[in-house]
């Protein structure tokens, strides 16, 4: 059984039945049959479904936000923002459908016509996490449904309400039954799904361990995978012209979603000239933050996704401090109340070779590093096995862009956060995974770019091509 373990209260709520292995064949057969029909629909019909889905997300924003507030503790204002982004994604792919799926005509080269057409490849498996329950699904589902692929979606076990809502909205929007199938399944059941010949590709957002397992099985079965596995993103400040404003931006972005965002800036890197001012300012800023329930309008952050997640982070911080791997300047303790609450924390003097220095902390923990100059700041930023996103902050845009060009990430921003938008590609390198989602790149992963070359029988291009 899956149950909502409400992180706001620590209490178990609704329960949902998990599938058993005997149901796998039926699920995949239904998805395959649906694919044969869905791929044959006109682009206009698919776009209309996505457009209606966007409308439904907006119409149900309050209900949908409440689901994820109860499931994983997301503050209501953040939850509503997530639902709106999802609506934007579905609407983007609806409005740009013809542009994104347009045939590409190539120079004829002794043929009468040479064209590359974007075609679907079949049923896809999505394995999605709990931190953005609607957004992660939309990022994968919208472009692939537009292409004509069908989807089997295994969501995080703590998000049963929101995962079912994703299917319900698409079906109400006009998507044929079984073109999107939500399943309540365990991670251990996924290997058989990935290996099954009826699944033609798999997208996972989650842990490195899960990503490695999926990539291995997908590779052994000659099918494509897309992985988004988190990050330890740097936030470089190269001058102190607007220091307090920049630090406010950092704190806002780092603590967004209670610090549970893959592309949040985990490592703040500042020059030694203004390091002490940075630490002093953030120590007070973070110490003054209010922790509350998901529906508390005055809360700065909410609970962690689960009591277990909270306990793991607190234990890591305590161990780091005890071993001399970091100094906890403020926070980092459990809050004595029912639910998965902790004090937001600020760490300094972090040894980058230790757990808290080199591994992602998925919670409300800010880390400040000191660099003697810009060159060392770049070196610290690139001293990571991750490579999701980064940002550079400075008043000299040319200098900031020069720094940005030296960072080894999938996405780099100057004077703004690692933003998510339907029209921007999303993805990383190294231990952060591979592949791209959103914008035109979203229809470029699970697609057959099919070459058609047409020649008359009297065309000299018919001779062997060797």
What are these regions (language model features)?
Residues 1-112:
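N-terminal Rossmann-like NAD(P)+-binding subdomain of aldehyde/semialdehyde dehydrogenases
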Residues 7, 21-24, 43, 61, ...:
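Residues at or immediately preceding the N-termini of alpha-helices
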Residues 9-15, 199, 236, 284, ...:
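Conserved C-terminal structural/oligomerization subdomain of aldehyde/semialdehyde dehydrogenase
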Residues 12-19, 34-40, 125-126, 235-238, ...:
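Short, well-ordered beta-strand elements within core beta-sheets of diverse protein domains
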Residues 105-245, 371:
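Rossmann-like NAD(P) dinucleotide-binding subdomain of oxidoreductase/dehydrogenase enzymes
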Residues 209-351, 414, 461-464:
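ALDH superfamily catalytic-core signature
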